[in-house]
Curated annotation (Swiss-Prot):
This is Testin. SUPFAM superfamilies: Glucocorticoid receptor-like (DNA-binding domain). Residues 155-164 have a biased composition (Basic and acidic residues). The gene is TES. Residues 234-297, 299-359, 362-421 form the LIM zinc-binding domain. Signal peptide: none annotated. It comes from Canis lupus familiaris. Belongs to the prickle / espinas / testin family. The N-terminal and the C-terminal halves of the protein can associate with each other, thereby hindering interactions with ZYX. Keywords: Cell junction, Cytoplasm, LIM domain, Metal-binding, Repeat, Zinc. Its main location: cytoplasm.
Length: 421
């Protein structure tokens, strides 16, 4: 029965979002269909985050699980039905009166997420300091951006072994220990406050690894009291530019209270995207999103996108792969010991390359084998042979010779070019 339940759960996972249109490929994609072990659509090869899949509840469960057993349990609520932790997103609704000719109408703006602060004016200021295309207003480009970053920055398969493909019991245990470690040592959520509000905390408090705050020694507090009044200049830890005292700033507790960021500067140090919902991972003086923090700790399989917990894996083309996942990107045949060609950083077997990706020779109009030498000029290619790379007029072999290109034709001389014009 337990095995049946697992199989059913896996099946439901593959049904999720089935048929959703691709926002990137548009009508070229027949609709989302999850690949069996890759985290992409079987039809268009784009990720789930590129499709119009309704995942609000699923994403709230994912973030809720991330915050489970951490100091951020105030941000989650457990469902009475199954006890699953759910992320309590702070949704902000603003109403603005709009003057009309006869009466006043109300314009309502809903933010799908906002900083969980009591001062709504501060939260509103925070939103206004973000680029407009990244403000999570419901139904906008910014809301779509947030949804995409939730999927990209916080992959469910980076924290939940049940979302991974065929882990061994040993790998499951290692992953659980890894997740427990990063929750206690790196995970954090930014705070939005005015810089002056944090001065007292930076002088009277000290940061304790693990997330707790405690009062510093009274002597230290007395020594720093004068510094509190002297400090009037605030600068962003990221861009080093000055910050206005009345503007909201973001603090990351794990970084310490002496560091602050502009709202638009609170980004991952690797991908430079806004840290979604201000969820960060702190390591060696840098902010990371969940994905890139994990990448700094473990190898990630370029095939299935999962972290590798096995001691045995392969490296090819500056990427890491589970042994069973070093496969052709087109047909999924294993490539160990086989000839392959990299196409857009993805390995493709020789038959699939010739069939789907090979350039066509302008001379014989056949696909050019990846192992065969060729001549390329602009977007045109020829077999580097005496049979194909010839003058389009007199058929003189042009290998090693000067030539005159005209669209898909080549000529050995001005005379030959004139004869064909």
């Amino acid at each position: 029965m337990e095995l049946e339940a697992k199989v059913k759960k896996m099946g439901l996972g593959h049904e999720q979002g089935f048929g959703a249109p691709c926002l990137k490929c548009k009508e070229k994609c027949e609709g989302f269909e999850l690949h069996f072990w890759r985290k992409i659509c079987r039809n268009c090869k784009c990720g789930q985050e590129e499709h119009d899949v309704l995942l609000s509840n699923e994403e709230d469960r994912k973030v809720g699980k991330l915050f489970e057993d951490t100091k951020y349990t105030t941000l989650i609520a457990k469902l009475k039905s199954d006890g699953i932790p759910m992320y309590k997103r702070n949704v902000m609704i603003l109403t603005n009166p709009v003057a009309a000719k006869k009466n006043v109408s109300i314009n309502t703006v809903t933010y799908e997420w906002a900083p969980p602060v009591q001062n709504q004016a501060l939260a509103r200021q925070y939103m206004q300091m973000l680029p407009k295309e990244k403000q999570p207003v419901a139904g906008s480009e910014g809301a779509q951006y947030r949804k995409k970053q939730l999927a990209k920055q916080l992959p469910a398969h980076d924290q939940d072994p049940s979302k991974c493909h065929e882990l061994s019991p040993k790998e499951v245990k290692e992953m659980e220990q890894f997740v427990k470690k990063y929750k206690s040592e790196a995970l954090g959520v930014g705070d939005v406050k005015l810089p002056r509000e944090m001065d007292a905390q930076s002088t009277n408090r000290m940061y304790i690894p693990g997330g707790d705050r405690s009062t510093a020694a009274a002597v230290g507090a007395m020594e720093d009291k004068s510094a509190e009044h002297k400090r009037t200049q605030y600068s962003c830890y990221c861009c080093k530019q000055s910050m206005k005292e009345g503007d909201p700033a973001i603090y990351a507790e794990r970084a310490g209270y002496d560091k602050l960021w502009h709202p638009a500067c609170f980004v991952c140090s690797t991908c430079h995207e806004l840290l979604v919902d201000m969820i960060y991972f702190w390591k060696n003086g840098k902010l990371y999103c969940g994905r890139h923090y994990c990448d700094s700790e473990k190898p990630r399989c370029a095939g299935c996108d999962e972290l590798i917990f096995s001691n045995e894996y392969t490296q090819a083309e500056n990427q890491n792969w589970h042994l069973k996942h070093f496969c052709c990107f087109d047909c999924d045949n294993i490539l160990a010991g086989e000839i392959y060609v990299m196409v857009n950083d993805k390995p493709v077997c020789k038959p699939c390359y010739v069939k789907n990706h090979a350039v066509v020779c302008q001379g014989c109009h056949n696909a050019i084998d990846p192992e065969v030498q060729r001549v390329t000029y602009n977007n045109f290619s020829w077999h580097a042979s005496t049979e194909c790379f010839l003058c389009s007029c007199c058929s003189k072999c042009l290998i090693g010779q000067k030539f005159m290109p005209v669209e898909g034709m080549v000529f050995c001389s001005v005379e030959c070019k004139k004869m064909m014009s």
